[in-house]
UniProtKB/Swiss-Prot annotation:
<dbReference type="GO" id="GO:0008782">
    <property type="term" value="F:adenosylhomocysteine nucleosidase activity"/>
</dbReference>
<keyword id="KW-0378">Hydrolase</keyword>
<dbReference type="GO" id="GO:0009164">
    <property type="term" value="P:nucleoside catabolic process"/>
</dbReference>
<feature type="binding site">
    <location>
        <position position="156"/>
    </location>
    <ligand>
        <name>substrate</name>
    </ligand>
</feature>
<dbReference type="GO" id="GO:0019284">
    <property type="term" value="P:L-methionine salvage from S-adenosylmethionine"/>
</dbReference>
<protein>
    <recommendedName>
        <fullName>5'-methylthioadenosine/S-adenosylhomocysteine nucleosidase</fullName>
        <ecNumber>3.2.2.9</ecNumber>
    </recommendedName>
</protein>
<dbReference type="GO" id="GO:0019509">
    <property type="term" value="P:L-methionine salvage from methylthioadenosine"/>
</dbReference>
<keyword id="KW-0028">Amino-acid biosynthesis</keyword>
<keyword id="KW-0486">Methionine biosynthesis</keyword>
<feature type="binding site">
    <location>
        <begin position="177"/>
        <end position="178"/>
    </location>
    <ligand>
        <name>substrate</name>
    </ligand>
</feature>
<dbReference type="Pfam" id="PF01048">
    <property type="entry name" value="PNP_UDP_1"/>
</dbReference>
<dbReference type="InterPro" id="IPR000845">
    <property type="entry name" value="Nucleoside_phosphorylase_d"/>
</dbReference>
<feature type="active site" description="Proton acceptor">
    <location>
        <position position="12"/>
    </location>
</feature>
<dbReference type="GO" id="GO:0005829">
    <property type="term" value="C:cytosol"/>
</dbReference>
<comment type="function">
    <text>Catalyzes the irreversible cleavage of the glycosidic bond in both 5'-methylthioadenosine (MTA) and S-adenosylhomocysteine (SAH/AdoHcy) to adenine and the corresponding thioribose, 5'-methylthioribose and S-ribosylhomocysteine, respectively. Also cleaves 5'-deoxyadenosine, a toxic by-product of radical S-adenosylmethionine (SAM) enzymes, into 5-deoxyribose and adenine.</text>
</comment>
<feature type="binding site">
    <location>
        <position position="78"/>
    </location>
    <ligand>
        <name>substrate</name>
    </ligand>
</feature>
<feature type="active site" description="Proton donor">
    <location>
        <position position="201"/>
    </location>
</feature>
Length: 233
């Protein structure tokens, strides 16, 4: 089985890359692929670049050229739900776009025409993650939460951005800039996927400071959780 893992930034893939054995690097159209093994599993690790277009491009290249049987997205996210703290992990059971509006034609806010309104994380992978992380976080000050992640081509920190997202997605847990695009490509290629992100900021007016300070913590937390999951796949 080949497992695809995608992170947007160098910081988000560094720990995973350093955990790989027999690493081969390939660059295609600016997307950096690292091919090797983690936890005795064949892995294709992608540093895609930031934003939905980079994520979609890289995921498409991965799906077409490397044929992964599973795709996992790692990285950081901004927490939107009450009670979340930096270092908590969000496992997405659903994903949506927060900046797509074709409602005049009868679509749900966030829905790309002729695509689902929400992209569903793979139920089998979700179940495995839930079992693993219940034990993993039992003695930790952080926690794993499950729910809706919303993707925007903007860094969310202003009250007006919050208001729009909460109006259309009142149960949102976290926001970020790539996951729904990865999910859409995985959906179109019929590849099971799971989004595992760690909270780097609380998507508020201190978010830029928090992100810069805690991106490495969030990346480490997310990557560590993924390595634990790989041991069970």
């Amino acid at each position: 089985m080949t497992i695809g893992i995608i992170g947007a930034m160098e910081e988000e893939v560094e720990l995973l890359k350093n955990s790989m054995s027999s690493v081969e690097e390939i660059v295609i159209g600016g997307a950096k692929f690292y091919i090797g093994e983690i936890a005795s599993k064949e892995v294709v690790l992608l540093e895609s670049g930031i934003g939905k277009v980079n994520a979609a491009l890289g995921t498409t290249l991965m799906a077409d050229r490397f044929k992964p049987e599973v795709i996992i997205n790692t990285g950081s996210a901004g927490g939107m739900a009450e009670g979340l703290a930096v270092g908590d992990v969000i496992i997405s059971d659903r994903l949506a776009y927060g900046d797509v509006d074709v409602t005049e034609f009868g679509y749900t806010y966030g829905q790309v025409p002729r695509m689902p309104a929400f992209y569903q994380g793979d139920a089998v992978l979700l179940k495995k993650a839930e079992t693993i992380y219940r034990e993993y976080f039992a003695t930790s000050e952080n926690k794993a939460v499950y729910g809706l992640v919303v993707t925007n081509d903007s860094f969310i920190m202003r009250p007006d951005q919050h208001e729009i997202i909460r109006t259309f997605f009142p149960d949102v847990k976290a926001v970020e800039m790539e996951a729904a695009a990865i999910a859409q490509v995985a959906y179109q290629f019929d590849i099971p996927f799971l989004i595992i992100r760690a909270i780097s900021d609380l998507a508020n007016q201190e978010a830029t400071i928090s992100f810069d300070e805690f991106i490495h913590l969030a990346a480490k937390q997310s990557a560590t959780c993924i390595i634990e999951l790989l041991k069970t796949i």
